[in-house]
Amino acid sequence: MAKKQKKLDEISKKFGDERQKALDNALKNIEKDFGKGAIMRLGERAEQKVQVMSSGSLALDIALGAGGYPKGRIIEIYGPESSGKTTVALHAVAQAQKEGGIAAFIDAEHALDPSYAAALGVNIDELLLSQPDSGEQGLEIAGKLIDSGAVDLVVVDSVAALVPRAEIDGDIGDSHVGLQARMMSQAMRKLSASINKTKTIAIFINQLREKVGVMFGNPETTPGGRALKFYASVRLDVRGNTQIKGTGDEKDTNVGKETKIKVVKNKVAPPFKEAFVEIMYGEGISKTGELIKIATDLDIIKKAGAWYSYNDEKIGQGSENAKKYLADHPEVFGEIDRQVRVRYGLIDGDDMAEAVGNKAESPVETLEEVTLDLDDAIEIEE
């Protein structure tokens, strides 16, 4: 019995060695034909954690779970008219430029306001802008930019405005059933691999439509077919809520609106989280406002009555004064922002602990400067 088992083990080992040899040869041939990295074992990848770029909003970074938009993925931002979709995308553009990247904006709606973009922090002198004549042209331009590998972020505004060339050349009233959906489906098939390879973030802004005759369920849908829904790693639903009134002389004036951003699809973190931000007219997302709210909830900023304090120091009476304090003290803003991100696990706490430790008493004492004359120096040398 033992001899039979030993023989079976030898056969299995020999057969296993032959299989491994055949697999190694196959891997070598694949790399020879298609290049190094065409196939690999998943454990061999140096970077298994998804790389992200901040969305430009702390609340949205937290809702996304990974700390921002995943690189090399497709993002869809949709919602009703004037809900803040383009504002959310422009904050991503400003963040990409802030991190030293290059951003491109495909303005299919021909409605980009350069002044508003600049107010949100976008460097309009460095922003690549295209206003295509047709949907095919816009997607082709986006594809060439992505294939170059030199662009970090591409925004398409919007999918609904990507009109197929056949529809433009035809007459109003002509039927073009499924034309835009087929165009988007082909574009997604071509772009998805290139987007992942070049680690470019592609943001597609989309509008809302309503299905006819829907009695039960949500009648809302997005134009462009289902391809974008499938290929998108993240889908954001942007909805404007209540209006924000001003203070003082502007107490009866609408100065902004509270906006809810819901992550309805997320392939890199748990979905269905929500972010509530204040979009101020002419300014964009109030970063100081969202930081105060989140830091107060985490008890990083203390609130007693109407007063806000940080590290036992009062920073303002009322939220508006606290916002002004943080805007005037960017170092305090950055310190609180880092603490919030560490608490939510968006960044590693080791770097922050090291920075805080450096502020504490140093273990190395500072030596006083001692002046020696030449005779003392010779005596020490001897």
UniProtKB/Swiss-Prot annotation:
Q: Which organism is it from?
A: Streptococcus sanguinis (strain SK36)
Organism superkingdom: Bacteria
A GO MF term: ATP-dependent DNA damage sensor activity
Q: Which PROSITE patterns match?
A: RECA_1, RECA_2, RECA_3
UniProt: ATP binding residues: G79, P80, E81, S82, S83, G84, K85, T86
Tell me which Pfam families the record gives.
RecA, RecA_C
Disulfide bond positions: none
Write out the GO biological process terms: DNA recombination; DNA repair; SOS response
Q: Which UniProt keywords apply?
A: ATP-binding, Cytoplasm, DNA damage, DNA recombination, DNA repair, DNA-binding, Nucleotide-binding, SOS response
One Gene Ontology cellular component annotation?
cytosol
- Reported function: Can catalyze the hydrolysis of ATP in the presence of single-stranded DNA, the ATP-dependent uptake of single-stranded DNA by duplex DNA, and the ATP-dependent hybridization of homologous single-stranded DNAs. It interacts with LexA causing its activation and leading to its autocatalytic cleavage.
Compartments it resides in? Cytoplasm
Q: Which family does it belong to?
A: Belongs to the RecA family.
**What name has this protein been given in UniProt?**
Protein RecA
